[in-house]
Amino acid sequence: MIKKASLLTACSVTAFSAWAQDTSPDTLVVTANRFEQPRSTVLAPTTVVTRQDIDRWQSTSVNDVLRRLPGVDITQNGGSGQLSSIFIRGTNASHVLVLIDGVRLNLAGVSGSADLSQFPIALVQRVEYIRGPRSAVYGSDAIGGVVNIITTRDHPGTEISAGWGSNSYQNYDVSTQQQLGDKTRVTLLGDYAHTHGYDVVAYGNTGTQAQPDNDGFLSKTLYGALEHNFTDVWSGFVRGYGYDNRTNYDAYYSPGLPLVDTRKLYSQSWDAGLRYNGELIKSQLITSYSHSKDYNYDPHYGRYDSSATLDEMKQYTVQWANNIIIGHGNIGAGVDWQKQSTAPGTAYVEDGYDQRNTGIYLTGLQQVGDFTFEGAGRSDDNSQFGRHGTWQTSAGWEFIEGYRFIASYGTSYKAPNLGQLYGSYGNPNLNPEKSKQWEGAFEGLTAGVNWRISGYRNDVSDLIDYDDHTLKYYNEGKARIKGVEATANFDTGPLTHTVSYDYVDARNAITDTPLLRRAKQQVKYQLDWQLYDFDWGITYQYLGTRYDKDYSSYPYQTVKMGGVSLWDLAVAYPVTSHLTVRGKIANLFDKDYETVYGYQTAGREYTLSGSYTF
């Protein structure tokens, strides 16, 4: 039975960047309801990834981390740095809320969806991933789920690492965390990553002429943080990071025209916070500022030529969160304020625009005997579409010790992006997309196996579609998504197993046709063990059939893309207590497959890396 005492002592909103690296049921998570709580008390399906997991998997991108998680389907227009989309439980890529240290990712404000191919893996210390509706807690976008990437680290000392691999991949990273007296801690990081890449596009799918070239990626990152404890209950922090990325890609091309095939992204973020961590009352105030400049251009003409485009956005955020422990649970409440400003020309919108949103929310969690109840409600006041309300509720019943039934219902929404509102084909009268979701689940511990099986349904209305006849965007689409998700983890002797299965039937509710680019079935399996000081890991992933569009000729044709089984092999060896070497083979059997029609994947890839700590 879940211990109430652990909930009472753990509930807190002291930080979105929880430092716990343990993945046990009592690991503290903050993303589900904006306050710290043991993961076992979260009724929504929750997954936590630590930096140790990322190092063990030897992931070189955020997408490689997320693709391993239940309910996640990643599609990408090629290799490193290429445009990618995250589908959670069959919902649109724009229906995933991505947070960085609890603050909305700025880049998603331009396109309406988060492209994590550009976010440096070096910054990721922890990922908290929640499936299901969370608009009642966070507002817009949280229809399919929430991904909270946490950059705060708790690794005193210095680490130097380097890696090399296929397609001329190289990576160099230096980080340090030092204590300045008893109450102050400083963290610094610098990272450089580069790959020559490969030709990502199959011939004939980018216009009248093929582009046989390497499509590489370059990323340079800096990070700094200062944390200070003023007293036993008051603390504060200042944090900033920035990255400078360049991506070469294949684009639609006709002879005689500039070939816009290079992306240059500058992004910087700054935030500061003050926290009060009392015995019964917790509170935090966080302010943040982020600025991104996203160029697409022909390198022969430069970023400032008339053929180039610039998407520039500034985002200002203020969050005030509070939590009070009451009985065997707590009540949380807070206010979010956000302003997004775009420069003229962003997202093909001639004028610059400001969009402001103020949200107030209330959350609650209470344990009564063998029952756990959870609820949340939120009201958003948006400068474009006015006021919108969402709510959710869940109940868990531990009917036998170690076994629990969970039922939940929630509403959520997605606000239209700036291009849909104000672009050349925009419609300023668009309403938010709306969702209603139901889920039922059983979970338990049987013979050493931690397992969970859930079924869900998601009805999405007022989907924003483009009308070919009126050349405008309208709220005229509907989607119906049904799915089953099963997860389990267990040990057999020295072997650790983690497995998940997803079945997703995502359809257009009007035409009854499958939604594009979603795999109908996925199987994911991770096997880890240690032998003679070598740490071994095998990753298996089955991607089922999916549908896409062939845009090489008009009218566009729907194509069916077959399933594929992928294997990765990773090994690490601690040469000394300070030096560790690692090696990995991705796509071990060199399978040829695509997740976006016409865009090739990398095939078999090798990486070799080492890290030295002191």
Curated annotation (Swiss-Prot):
Residues 38-152 form the TBDR plug domain. Pfam families: Plug (PF07715), TonB_dep_Rec_b-barrel (PF00593). Keywords: Calcium, Cell outer membrane, Ion transport, Membrane, Metal-binding, Porin, Signal, TonB box, Transmembrane, Transmembrane beta strand, Transport. One of its GO terms (cellular component) is cell outer membrane. A motif (TonB C-terminal box) lies at residues 597-614. HAMAP family: BtuB. This is Vitamin B12 transporter BtuB. The lineage of its organism: Bacteria, Pseudomonadati, Pseudomonadota, Gammaproteobacteria, Enterobacterales. The gene is btuB.
